[in-house]
């Protein structure tokens, strides 16, 4: 028997074909969300307060200090927040200290700072009753970047940019004349020496002393001449910079000094953040820049006087490590004191070394390092600027290397915590201005923190972020996998990121640093390809937001692969050689072969085993969770694997899902971490269990109660239904499944079913990827899903009196009211069809709505005969189903309702959708198709033992698409079915063809795994043997019920009087310009005329035509279309007198606006509602598909 048994949870054993020993378990798959938010609560929020506070008034007599903050209990529980359309948030109280510096008086007070949304255990937020996710953002890291560019003459120039987290950019560049320039904040360029002089190093010799003598420096000095002899060089430089930054304003050296200080050296205006400081120190550090260079001077220890390194020595890694302590200390440190006119007058400490030029052995080049400023220094220092200039000048000498902006060492992740902190900082900064003004205006003695703090800017900033940011998305809740993928998504879009239109091919492309960090396969098709990615299965963020991936360390001394795990970022990995996870190892952990496959900086090649530093921990570390669920991924073309990974996320939860016979072993962890299942929090014993509640007695005697969710509407309209897995008496351990969620079976993800599939054509019905299906799958509810739709009706106060929910609906027969209760609300369990009343509601009619007789009666009998209008909530088109639940909210019950609303009724209708022709289905290999025919079981082809086939697919769908994995899955699935086992074949480490054929033989199948099939209609065998097996097939969210649409009479647009478009508005089909040409080409003038008039916007014509049809009269001639009238009116609005004449030159009267209005015309308020609904649906669709 090939393979070995592996236990997944307590309910499933699979035969696994993996050969590689897993030394590291998968991390918690949603930790990117939960850990980041926890960091924000623990330290991020405190840092934001400390950044902005203390705040002083303009005269510096009062100061507001931050003391601390505390979160209190949330107002609503999770479930209550969902029901009441509220946010799951906790009130935050901040303690401030107000100090009066004149009297020394201190007032300490706790101030309510608004409700702050709290993350649920599942990594989501409940905002206004809807579950949302904050997508992590992939952005360019702050730091210093160097680049090269070739001009039109083929000359290489260099550039450099310092990018802060917030603040002005500082750029350097060379031109064709070999002069180096600098730009401050994207303004006009000035010679770089001008900035050096402004920093207080004004002499030409001083500049050459710092940077060394080079052609670039000399050319720039010649360009930068002293024009105004009355000014010092520094003052002149300062004025020149000021002129560039503030053109047109009077320039003085003092104003320039304060401007430059604010731009670069003031931590409140310029912030590199911890990551920017780390990146700058790493790039400008002397150790990395000396590596592999030949030193041109003796390196002497300043304390002992001994020669550490002699001139002419190559600075290899070992040499640098031997003097690392001195390099980090005072070795070759020089102190430069700026002149008195400088922007910053403190002494500048630099580390300077002379090395031999790699291009010209007779030349000596100076390398200047920034002497590693402390990590807490968040603003730039003059040393940083001089060291950046030195690196930039060294590039022209062949030293140093340019940066690749798409390298994941230069791109970092802003996760939830950081995005929230940034938003909170924006709110606090707005509040700061407000506080400062109030402190200055009001009397100091009576001021308290509560009086001067206005929290509105802060709460508005947070609300705006959760409500309308591009990164705050409605959770994709089709199934557990789509939830999990959404939480692990990385988007390069959003504020501060890229835009779709500007992003080129390079930024979207797969980069070698994606290995183990970002999935190269799972990304959307379409305009977002490559901009929206997914974290790889083992990916993890470090404290700076760079993605790390784990490796097993190799002990190079004895050449053994250890079980010690090292997490590396992309730029750390560049220094090492990494072997693949499937490298053959001896039992003692040494490499079995002298030469192993490995990679170094993106080169995949063979390396001697002695050179390998690390080994991959797992073959699946390269791919994301959804991709890791595709068996035989290694046999699929990557384009189809992309579709397979994406389509699994669109699977609809079925009534009775089944886990795949052929899985990858990832199904258990994906279901466990998705947040859709109920997981035990502690060890214990089950003391009560039913469909809605499970009670577990802990070992310490306390009781845990787990609530099971039954048929709740998910964000995507599917049924979110959990099923209890444990029974009374069961012992559960922490982390065990208590209940399956939607699309789960026995603690594993189960997106679809395991039908018997044959690759064969059948009467041409599976042309173009279509799927032919057996009626058994319909009758036995194999692919049946439950969908829930929510409808609501509210009563408001109108000018004519309040609306009322009642059973007394005017002009409606008793038949239509049979399922309404005494209040006029539908009963739970009622079966409803399109047009049925769900909530009976009447609205008072206005005077203008009454006829003359009614007005007379009203005048005689007073208020009693006041008429009401029927505004009941009815089942919309396509909303048939069974009433699952009714929720009533009233002020009397203490529910919070919008102003003007007296009562709100929500009705939930459940639909049971069986699979039907037009529904979309797919396998896991990108093999998708639409159901084209459902064939009676007796007509389906059958196996020699009489078993009918369930699905027939077209064999032509395989070769050109190169997704052979589906065929391997088919054969292995049949073997698993025959053996009664489940199989795990992990990606890149699964069943080989030998394993496959051995399992096929074990299952007693034929040696080619094909079989003779018999035609169900004739009983005759088909001519050739057919591949028949079990393939995992899923039903996708694209169902024909949601798409099929037809209209006879419906709403019209108000201005053009043409039918609206789209299913949501019950619109018509657009007959566009090109379709009109087609009818013109055929000369079908009558058809064309009625399409352009009656069927479109000839208001009077369509009324008369309708009347003629109903009365059986001939249809009259059409009139003038409304759109023509709109054109005439638009021309008249331009002052052109335009009239329409008939053939006898008589003027044609055009319809007035208020003429001919009919019930079919959609009024403005209806149109607004329709538009809102359409916008909401469009947004939901966009969020669930476009950003997937």
UniProtKB/Swiss-Prot annotation:
GO terms for cellular component: DNA-directed RNA polymerase complex. One of its GO terms (biological process) is DNA-templated transcription. Keywords: DNA-directed RNA polymerase, Nucleotidyltransferase, Transcription, Transferase. The keyword Transcription applies. It comes from the Bacteria. It holds the Pfam family RNA_pol_Rpb2_2. It catalyses: RNA(n) + a ribonucleoside 5'-triphosphate = RNA(n+1) + diphosphate. SUPFAM superfamilies: beta and beta-prime subunits of DNA dependent RNA-polymerase (SSF64484). One of its GO terms (molecular function) is DNA-directed RNA polymerase activity. Its EC number is 2.7.7.6. The RNAP catalytic core consists of 2 alpha, 1 beta, 1 beta' and 1 omega subunit. When a sigma factor is associated with the core the holoenzyme is formed, which can initiate transcription. DNA-dependent RNA polymerase catalyzes the transcription of DNA into RNA using the four ribonucleoside triphosphates as substrates. HAMAP family: RNApol_bact_RpoB. Belongs to the RNA polymerase beta chain family. This is DNA-directed RNA polymerase subunit beta. It comes from Streptococcus equi subsp. zooepidemicus (strain H70).
